Swiss-Prot record:
GO molecular function terms attached to this record: amino acid transmembrane transporter activity
Gene3D superfamilies named among the record's database cross-references: Amino acid/polyamine transporter I
UniProt organism field: Salmonella typhimurium (strain LT2 / SGSC1412 / ATCC 700720)
UniProt KW Cell inner membrane keyword: yes
Subcellular location: Cell inner membrane
An individual GO BP term: amino acid transport
Name of the protein described by the UniProt record: Inner membrane transporter YjeM
Gene behind the chain: yjeM
Alphabetical list of NCBIfam families matching this protein: PRK15238.1 (NF011775)
Pfam (any one): AA_permease_2
GO CC terms in record: plasma membrane
């Protein structure tokens, strides 16, 4: 059957990377936190983390293009199975938690599109509280996603393409409207250009700036998720590396350019110093400001300019909903594929590794859907205790999601040392360049994770959060080691069973 399964084009792969990595909301958040002084930190994060890490992924992906297991296969073939399983299991677990939160979050942009504002806190149906209504919608969303995704990679690629196009269109609107405003206003920027100090009084201390560096580094995360799609890509020996390199360059330039353009239409002191502005609504406030400023530049009446602003916010809501949808489809399948199809089949019950007619591990996908749905219902209907439990889960996933970058970067020199691989794409041609790139990425990711853990302690003496963040990777590692040890014991007791 496998020869009938359609593969993804280069454009499809680029759009998938774009929806997985480029969060349109990251540039408004950066402008809100740091103004123009965010740009040097974004460039720093791209040069010292994102671009070298993306190039490592491109080399590994093109060399291991026939492997089904994504990052698990890469680490397994470079270092060893136990190392690979712990890193991949930790990464997969944190994406399950990501799905729990995002399935509920996705309704905010949807509500903004339909009603012109976030009304999710006012949704009451049949005596249910808003949190419970959103929880039920999130479960329905999970079921719909799994139902469509189980029908094949082509369905996922089509949806992520729509998401990727929506994000690109938002960026295009930002670019074209900002240029139009500049021309209409005689080249005048609403925000004074200053790359060294933040207009936000809360971001003047060294500690706050370091926390922003972490924010910038994490904005570039997610490219490893497309690793599981190498074998689903057309001509992967050429297209996979091309797709990653092209997407990495566009994303790196895109973030800094987007931050720069926000200052054309929005003055930080006038619009963003209001206490009602927060990281949850900043994207819609900035897009509304962009529309209103365009209306004013075109000499429309104040009411008409405000209406333009409201419609800009609505269109942003729709585009963000589509972008979330695209990311959700990729991330509901790719991490699961790495952990199920990459690892030895004997690790899992037989139905979990069985592929349907479309080449998808449908049973495993439905089990994941049930697990995520149970978590959502527990958090939505469990009251304060469940809410506290969810906050702790999120803290546990905080570090667990990015620690696998360390596992992957540390596996890279081992991958380069192998002499038996056909390498269609090689960028790091010397041992020195390999070690420098690995060292820089490892140092940057280690700093980001260590700082994330100690920040609550330094700022508020909050040891509880710090311990939960340390506990996450430890818990997921111990669970992975227990699963792997159980497999090893059964394998040594009955080698024939393991080979089945």
């Amino acid at each position: 059957m496998t020869h009938t399964i359609k593969k993804m084009s280069l454009i499809g792969l680029i759009l998938m990377i774009f929806t997985s990595v480029f969060g349109f909301a990251n540039s408004p958040s950066a402008f809100y936190l740091m103004g123009y002084s965010a740009i040097p930190w974004y460039i720093f994060s791209a040069l010292l983390f994102f671009i070298p890490f993306a190039l490592m992924m491109a080399e590994m992906g093109s060399a291991y293009r026939k492997e089904e297991g994504g990052i698990y296969s890469w680490m397994n073939n470079s270092v060893g199975p136990r190392y690979a399983f712990i890193g991949t299991f930790m990464w997969f677990s944190s994406y399950v938690i990501w799905m729990v939160s995002t399935a509920a979050k996705i309704w905010v942009p949807f509500s903004t599109f339909v009603f012109g504002a976030d009304m999710t806190q006012h949704w009451r149906i049949a005596g249910l509280e808003p949190t419970q209504v959103v929880g039920l919608l999130a479960v329905g969303w999970m079921i719909l996603v799994t139902c469509v995704a189980a029908r094949g990679i082509n369905k996922i690629a089509r949806i992520t393409a729509v998401g990727g196009i929506a994000v690109m269109c938002l960026n295009l609107v930002l670019l074209l409207v900002s240029v139009a405003i500049l021309l209409l206003n005689g080249g005048h920027f609403a925000q004074e250009i200053n790359f060294t100090s933040s207009p936000n009084p809360g971001y003047h201390s060294g500690l706050a700036m370091l926390s922003f560096v972490v924010f910038a580094i994490f904005a570039y995360g997610g490219i490893e998720a497309v690793g599981g799609l190498v074998d689903k890509t057309e001509k992967p020996e050429k297209n996979f590396a091309k797709g990653i390199v092209f997407a990495a360059i566009v994303i790196s330039i895109g973030y800094s350019l987007a931050i720069f353009l926000w200052g054309v239409s929005t003055n930080w002191q006038q619009i963003l110093s209001n206490s009602a502005v927060n990281l949850g609504n900043i994207t819609y406030i900035l897009m509304s400001s962009l529309g209103t400023t365009l209306g004013n530049a075109l000499n429309l009446s104040p009411e008409a300019a405000m209406t333009v602003g409201v419609w800009f916010a609505r269109i942003t809501g729709l585009s963000m909903f589509l972008a979330y949808t695209g990311a959700f489809f990729t991330l509901s399948y790719s991490p699961l594929k790495a952990i199920i199809q990459g690892t030895p089949k004997a690790l899992w019950p037989a139905p979990m590794t069985t592929l349907n007619a479309n080449g998808m591990p449908a049973t495993a996908m439905w089990l994941q859907c049930v697990l995520v749905s149970l978590f959502i219902l527990l958090v939505s209907f469990g009251g304060d205790t469940a809410s506290a439990f969810y906050n702790k889960l999120t803290l546990m996933a905080n570090v667990s999601m990015t620690l696998p970058y360390l596992f992957l970067a540390l596996a890279f020199p081992f991958f380069k040392a192998r002499q038996d691989l056909e390498r269609p794409f090689v960028l790091f041609k010397t041992k020195a360049s390999t070690l420098v790139a690995t060292g820089v990425v490892v140092l940057v990711v280690t700093f980001a994770n260590v700082f994330t853990i100690i920040q609550p302690v330094i700022e508020a003496g909050d040891w509880d959060s710090a311990l939960w963040m340390i506990g996450g990777p430890i818990f997921f590692s111990l669970l992975a080691m227990a699963i792997y040890q159980n497999y090893s014991s059964r394998m040594s007791a009955d080698p024939e069973w393991a080979a089945e």
